[in-house]
């Protein structure tokens, strides 16, 4: 089940109302507004609890998202590029979050650097359509994946620390 910290994080991210994907042009604009509001609230919450860990932006249509996420391990900050497309069947289908710089470096990843979320995250997403959005995918998908995989990859020497301005991987 979900631990107390995750439950608290989840309860602080606004739930979305509009069930629309990129194909529903007019409703998609409303859905995007809700997505941005939830993301802004999630980032504000992270900053206020000193757990800020990603930056995202999208193309004008809101169908391609990209940015940076980071993980702090032994007081060193490891940064990774993050990207994903919004599926045409969104929100019924969750976005597939990719860390292209880690492509091929772990078994818990698909081709192109897409992180494996099938066992735990996707069933939870399916039960919460259309209430979950991008902020929820980051909180329930990418954050736990980073917390499990990055320390392991560092210990194995697969991921190495890079100075500021360089991307880890």
Swiss-Prot record:
The active site is at residue 116. One of its GO terms (cellular component) is cytoplasm. Coiled coil: none annotated. GO terms for biological process: protein K69-linked ufmylation. SUPFAM superfamilies: UBC-like (SSF54495). InterPro entries: UBQ-conjugating_enzyme/RWD, Ufc1. Keywords: Ubl conjugation pathway. Signal peptide: none annotated. PANTHER family: UBIQUITIN-FOLD MODIFIER-CONJUGATING ENZYME 1. This is Ubiquitin-fold modifier-conjugating enzyme 1. It comes from Culex quinquefasciatus.
């Amino acid at each position: 089940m979900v631990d107390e910290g995750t439950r608290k994080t989840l309860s602080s991210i606004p739930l979305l109302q509009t069930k629309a994907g990129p194909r529903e042009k007019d409703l998609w604009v409303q859905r995007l507004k809700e997505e941005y509001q939830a993301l802004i609230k999630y980032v504000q919450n992270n900053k206020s609890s000193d757990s800020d860990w990603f930056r995202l932006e999208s193309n004008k249509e809101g169908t391609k998202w990209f940015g940076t996420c980071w993980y702090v391990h032994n007081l060193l900050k490891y940064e990774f590029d993050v990207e994903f497309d919004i599926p045409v069947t969104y929100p019924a289908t969750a976005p597939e979050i990719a860390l292209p710089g880690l492509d091929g470096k772990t078994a818990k990843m698909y081709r192109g650097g897409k992180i494996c979320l099938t066992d735990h995250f996707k069933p939870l997403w399916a039960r919460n359509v259309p209430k979950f959005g991008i902020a929820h995918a980051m909180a329930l998908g990418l954050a736990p994946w980073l917390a499990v995989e990055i320390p392991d990859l560092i210990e194995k020497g697969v991921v190495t620390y890079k100075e500021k301005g360089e991307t880890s991987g």
